[in-house]
Amino acid sequence: MATVRICVCGDEGTGKSSLITSLVKGVFVTNKIQPILPQITIPPTIGTPENVTTTTVVDTSALPQERSNLAREIRKSNVILLVYSDHYSYERVALFWLPYFRSLGVNVPVVLCANKSDLAADHSEAQVIEEEMLPLMAEFKEIDSCIRTSAREHRNVNEAFFLCQKAVTHPIAPLFDSKESALKPAAVAALQRIFYLSDKDRDGYLSDKELEDFQMRCFEKPLSEEDLVHIKETIQKTHPTSVAPSGIDCRGFIHLNKMYAEKGRHETVWIILRAFQYTDNLSLQESFLHPRFEVPPYASAELSPEGYRFFVNLFLLSDKDNDGGLNDAELASLFAPTPGLPASWADGSFPSSTVRNEAGHVTLQGWLAQWSMTTFTSPKTTLEYLAYLGFESSDRSNPSTTAALKVTRPRKRRKRPGRVGRNVVLGHVLGPPGSGKSALLDAFLARGFSTTYHPTIQPRTAVNTVELPGGKQCYLILDELGELEPAILENQVKLLDQCDVIVYTYDSSDPDSFAYIPELRSKYPHLEELPSVFVALKADLDRTTQRAEYQPHEYTAMLNMPSSPLHVSVTWSSMQEVFVHIAEAAMEPSTAFPRSEEDVEGKWMAWGIALGAVVCAGAAAVMIWRRVSGSGT
């Protein structure tokens, strides 16, 4: 909502005070008026732009002794009504007033007002506009609009102040470059995005149905057949190829809005822009891009069913060749209404971070996995891109983009039996250099094995779906920390909050490999608070004795881990079972912690109770058989 402050300026005797009085009284006041009227505040009335709350009108004097007050009021205003009434005061507009405004460093729109039109009956409206106003508008871009008024006849008085309000609420300057006679680049970019979002079937045209939906969204009234024909005819006059049986293309849509701006109907363009959440500087509203969304400690964010449905539909619409994957051109088209790929995707080497087909194109599985990971690691990024990409909530109680997300239950006590209430989990893959961490991530994404060793410097991430026993699926994020490993492991609070499982890897064929793991756990003792899975990689090579205080199986037994290290090779077909094991450890964390003595004693007690129950049941059966046998003899 806007508060409009109008500063009325001009030479002495041009009728500034009479215009203000005529506005307030509704008629011309013949009595003598004081030289400078006090400030007045006008509440919204019929015809006031809907986003204006109050309008303040300030009268000023052009006398030299009042110059400091004049400068102060000009700086406080957000629009200037500049009044002239004869040839002398008209000449002063260009020679004094407009240069004076510039010297003050103000950047506000100016509405030029030719007052006392009742005294210039020999000049027609068109002549005044052509000879006086248009040359000034061409020279001074700060002039938003012009109008002829008469305070005596109460002619166009209300309209003059309405133009001032509109100059604030619907400014022309951000939209149109009158010198170039073209829409400004930022306006074109915004309108291109609006066209893209309104083109629901992504065929490059706004069909009649899409135009009707667009009309209802922006103006809340239906588009008549007459208006539809008129729009197409208007575009066809200058861009014949922009109108086709399929509808109007983006070029025609941009041209239509350019015509609105040229003809002073820029209010129409602003209504369109604001319907799509644009601000006065043509950026998207901050509250729209970044709505309030809190994730409590030990909880996480995930896509809701509506969020997944949106990204599925977006993928299907963007897969133009129907090959089941998004190629570079299709991805570029999909992200056209956004600033580009999310920064985290570029840092994570997308699309190599997710599932691709043989041609290297991102599959639907990989697309959803990537967004699941983004939502988990940075829900604000997902919300921002949902806004850019045109997500529309079907939930009337929550019309914002947050309807596409949900928050999981906090998981604080991981050692308590039971599954965590989340479908996306994160595992850090730790191990010495050369242990096979990168090969593990490649295998997770079904990539071929490479014998060439490339040490990981930058962090690397992989995300994919894992099918758990029973048929339930979850998204598993595995990352290799690279040079950031010390910083991430030292941040205990963040590590325990975000990480769901630690995967310790070592090369079973390298005698110096395993010693890294006990040293790491000793250096960062809080790692013991996270579920753990030990994996012996390169099991296709000869296993060797480790030069460590304890052998791997002895170390895990000493920790009372539920199982010994898993011996696997990325060249084996059974490799996928490792990822199921890792996902299960994250989803049911109590199964991946060292078993305490109470757990072991409890297990033996359970066995004892079970055995005792069997013995008792057997003895009871014998007694019953004997009784039955005895009664039968």
Swiss-Prot record:
Keywords: Calcium, GTP-binding, Hydrolase, Membrane, Metal-binding, Mitochondrion, Mitochondrion outer membrane, Nucleotide-binding, Repeat, Transmembrane, Transmembrane helix. Its main location: mitochondrion. InterPro entries: EF-hand-dom_pair, EF_Hand_1_Ca_BS, EF_hand_assoc_1, EF_hand_assoc_2, EF_hand_dom, Miro, Miro-EF-hand_domain, MIRO_dom. GO terms for biological process: heme transport; mitochondrion inheritance; mitochondrion organization; mitochondrion-endoplasmic reticulum membrane tethering; phospholipid homeostasis; regulation of mitochondrion organization. Mitochondrial GTPase involved in mitochondrial trafficking. Probably involved in control of anterograde transport of mitochondria and their subcellular distribution. Residues 1-170, 422-588 form the Miro domain. Ca(2+) 2 binds at residues 319, 321, 323, 330. Residues 625-633 are mitochondrial intermembrane. Residues 398-418 are annotated as: Disordered. GO terms for cellular component: ERMES complex. It is found in: Mitochondrion outer membrane. Residues 1-603 are cytoplasmic. Residues 186-221, 306-341 form the EF-hand domain. This is Mitochondrial Rho GTPase 1. PROSITE patterns: EF_HAND_1, EF_HAND_2, MIRO. Residues 408-418 have a biased composition (Basic residues). It comes from the Eukaryota. GO terms for molecular function: calcium ion binding; GTP binding; GTPase activity. Belongs to the mitochondrial Rho GTPase family. GTP 1 binds at residues 10-17, 59-63, 115-118. GTP 2 binds at residues 431-438, 467-471, 537-540. Its EC number is 3.6.5.-. It is a single-pass type IV membrane protein. It comes from Aspergillus oryzae (strain ATCC 42149 / RIB 40) (Yellow koji mold). Ca(2+) 1 binds at residues 199, 201, 203, 205, 210.
